[in-house]
Amino acid sequence: MRECISVHVGQAGVQMGNACWELYCLEHGIQPDGQMPSDKTIGGGDDSFTTFFCETGAGKHVPRAVFVDLEPTVIDEIRNGPYRQLFHPEQLITGKEDAANNYARGHYTIGKEIIDPVLDRIRKLSDQCTGLQGFLVFHSFGGGTGSGFTSLLMERLSVDYGKKSKLEFSIYPAPQVSTAVVEPYNSILTTHTTLEHSDCAFMVDNEAIYDICRRNLDIERPTYTNLNRLISQIVSSITASLRFDGALNVDLTEFQTNLVPYPRIHFPLATYAPVISAEKAYHEQLSVAEITNACFEPANQMVKCDPRHGKYMACCLLYRGDVVPKDVNAAIAAIKTKRSIQFVDWCPTGFKVGINYQPPTVVPGGDLAKVQRAVCMLSNTTAIAEAWARLDHKFDLMYAKRAFVHWYVGEGMEEGEFSEAREDMAALEKDYEEVGIDSYEDEDEGEE
């Protein structure tokens, strides 16, 4: 089997993990205590779900996941929550004091005390796998644990499991809503450190998700639970092809092959449709063409940026539910003709398509309507550089005055790391800019 191990780091990672595992359990008919009643066995013994769950002798299904946080309160909620029997107690690893929004604490002082137990647990999980495919790491950019500890973990995973792919699901600091003043510092330090270790990073911007919840689901004041349930649908769409048998299945390495043209340009933009409340869904058709079209609306993106200002390098459409290739081809053909989608000229307009016949599942009592079909689009576009530019600008404003830097230096970091990280980000922006330049322009320059 091609197993995946999920690692959930820090408060954001753990809470995303809660939502995701809740959804996986519903999708596979696994009860909160890990049992799978025989009448619920889907499709008469489709065992693809073993990529994410391992089965014990007693017939219990245990997620292949590790939850880590440097302080216990968030993980304690799992220990006392409805899914407490699902996880092995040693899969929930907590420290005593938190990283206090400080990258240096997560990466150096406090992180290094907890990294070995975490790696031991990951080693035990990987020993249970017959053919480990890779890791999915969930975290935020802005928090201390999410930024600092994740980058430490990614470095160590690269050493221990060099050839395995590592995908990240990262919560990008929202442009308007901020949970910490030092988010730009943490984000840039973690991006710099994990850039060479991560194979593919799906970014999710809280503000974009807030807006989707407000606009499409009519939730006036979305809570993190609302946000995480929406995020979990996206994660589920991306991983569905690993967990179910499908017509056109996509595995982890296939994502990278199709979405990442250059090692550093590995930040695809995710878009999901239809995000719709039950009241509205009843009155709408939501055909393949409609949901495919919706993916090209900036309003449905997980990161605030405008793909109309950028160019696409690759595009991957993952359908699930009642979808046939004929409809998909028609929808894509329509988009190619009428949408102003600009691809870079060195990449012919390729759309990679995955189809999975398992319809999307919704959490009972959740906000999303039960629909027959859904689509998740992953596109690698140069527009995401806008997100980096915003972050870099905020970093510059603070760093020019060396504001808050003493907290980092006090935990054993050197000031040089800041400027080094910032230079790396400048290089990343430049990389994005160069990828978007038409190749025939380069040839003219060479002749002069």
UniProtKB/Swiss-Prot annotation:
Belongs to the tubulin family. GO terms for cellular component: cilium; cytoplasm; cytoskeleton; cytosol; extracellular exosome; extracellular region; microtubule; microtubule cytoskeleton. One of its GO terms (biological process) is mitotic cell cycle. Keywords: Acetylation, Amyotrophic lateral sclerosis, Cytoplasm, Cytoskeleton, GTP-binding, Hydrolase, Magnesium, Metal-binding, Methylation, Microtubule, Neurodegeneration, Nitration, Nucleotide-binding, Phosphoprotein. GTP binds at residues 11, 71, 140, 144-145, 179, 206, 228. This is Tubulin alpha-4A chain. The modification N6-acetyllysine is found at residue 40. The modification Phosphotyrosine is found at residue 432. One of its GO terms (molecular function) is metal ion binding. The active site is at 254.
